């Protein structure tokens, strides 16, 4: 449906009068020329036609989120309080005020509102988000998650001052699908021809801790959305290919920081981080494959955050900044690609990577923080290289503001490297750690690398003397607490 607003012809999605619309749809306006600039003024409102009630509104005068780092007081420290993941129902923007605190945190909301807030995946502390994103000739309006319901007609009203040279509209209507899908295979397509338009919409449709296996098939396309999955299990998330299905968002620690009164990312099972583009939190028995997940923000900004057990990734391309991926739990990765900055891989769990390619722009690839009784990061037949010729290193495990990691473990078996420092590792804080390698070769020549100047706490494994140890660390089930990943 094409209409004229201001001086530019515009196409609406969903089209005016459309039926069978996904309940997680975005509102997309496509112009003949570049999309007009947003003005940081005006309102977007959604009305339920039958009742006349306004069921959602976006105030464009409220900034999306912070653009500068917070200042924290001395009372803000890493919490050791176990986070309570139990819930009898999934909170949404329709039932709970966004910013309602959990896990001992202070409220995220303020009165009047400092920033936009959106409950995603039932996380009531909420996320800052961009209510409108423009790309080229397209403007996408992001409603609050889970405000639309099945089998209802809605009317969209957009004030004239939301965009420059815009006359506004208040007669854009559409009707959602009659009911939710009833099968265990859910389809996602951004064009609205499947069960859901977004990855998050499909995740929200799956019960917590499901004992029934589910599959989410994500069609080829570009999905610009912040994804947070909590309490999911027995789930396969499958895209159309690493470079065909792209899920991305501009998120980082500055934009979605930890609460004012507590820090995150130190003790497993405590208050979750909100800074990644794609988050699997308190999840078990998940397979992700044939997909690209990416943060487009700089700083402490993971493309993927995993808190969970028995999480398997195959042919997943992860792109981030500092800490490109954070992994806590038991994680298996095969034929994956990773691009990031220093500390590309931050982890407190047991992680086994097989035939993966890791690239960064200089500095350490890992910061290993596994605890006693758990294996750390193990790389088998992986490659390590740099994108700009700067020197890289395998990783580090220094003290962190007084905290040390005496049981940190990183093992490299038959890996290939380029532009790696002679020491291999840049910082190993304790002699009790286990940082070892076997058969490391040059990525370009295939020849063995010179290990004569390796870090004093690093260990070279011998093919004969350490034969059993090498075999053990080459076996996923040994590293992952008995779990043998299957795709």
Pin down the residues of each PLM region.
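Acidic, low-complexity Ser/Thr/Gly/Pro-rich repeat segments typical of extracellular/periplasmic
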Residues: 5-180
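Sequence-level preference for short, compositionally simple segments enriched
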Residues: 177-193, 197-487
